[in-house]
């Protein structure tokens, strides 16, 4: 199983349009960027997209234009699903899997596309392309939001998607013996946002869960570029 971070940014991305903050200025001067958060999961020569961001076309072009065989939506916020329309006239529209409230909400915006829809209940594992996938509830009010656990062979990887630190205990109980944790870290440690973790929250929770590695995701342009454990666009991780 191979996981690629197609994007590690928040809804506005970095650089943010019209912003001259140090992070955005550095991004414009160096070409560094944080596209909107999305993952590419590869196994058995199949490709699963986790969240279809507004930057999907650019993300796929940057990574060899892979054929996408399935999509999983974590929740119904614009920056996590609206890019699904980019499949129009590009490839066969892939099937989408999501928790029922997420699938119903997001799919309704794509009535002009014909695609298969799979309702997946949280905490009920399902197998696809040799990967066992389990959706688990997180806390991202007011949106119904799920994280995603991937298991293959002896490898376990989790993506929290957008969440604050109040993840249900039932979900935390799943997040043991992780090889990699991809965790929400929206803002620096001195800022509190009720529906996201800040950088300190992410580091504290990662310390409690003790994954072999962790990377912070969904970073706003307030996050400095040089903090430890930041996921970077294009990072790849391979597991047996």
Residues covered by each model-derived region:
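Residue-level marker for beta-strand->alpha-helix junctions and adjacent short loops that shape enzyme
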Residues: 10, 78, 103, 188, ...
């Amino acid at each position: 199983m191979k996981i690629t971070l197609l994007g590690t940014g928040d809804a506005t991305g970095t650089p943010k349009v019209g912003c001259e903050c140090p992070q955005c200025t550095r991004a414009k001067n160096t070409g560094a960027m944080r596209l909107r958060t999305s993952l590419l999961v590869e196994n058995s020569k199949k490709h699963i997209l986790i969240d279809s961001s507004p930057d999907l076309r650019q993300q796929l072009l940057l990574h060899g234009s892979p054929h996408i065989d399935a999509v999983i939506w974590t929740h119904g916020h614009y920056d996590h699903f609206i890019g699904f329309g980019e499949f129009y006239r590009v490839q066969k529209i892939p099937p989408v899997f999501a928790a029922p409230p997420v699938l119903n909400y997001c799919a309704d915006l794509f009535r002009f596309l014909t695609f298969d829809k799979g309702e997946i209940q949280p905490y009920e594992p399902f197998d696809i392309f040799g990967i066992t996938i389990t959706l688990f509830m997180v806390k991202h009010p007011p949106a119904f939001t799920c994280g995603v656990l991937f298991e293959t062979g002896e490898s376990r990887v989790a993506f929290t998607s957008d969440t604050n630190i109040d993840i249900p205990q039932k979900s935390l109980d799943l997040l043991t013996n992780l090889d990699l944790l991809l965790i929400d870290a929206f803002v620096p440690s001195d800022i509190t946002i009720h529906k996201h973790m800040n950088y300190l929250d992410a580091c504290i929770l990662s310390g409690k869960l003790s994954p072999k590695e962790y990377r912070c995701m969904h970073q706003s342009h307030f996050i400095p570029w040089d903090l430890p454990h930041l996921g970077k666009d294009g990072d790849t991780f391979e597991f047996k």
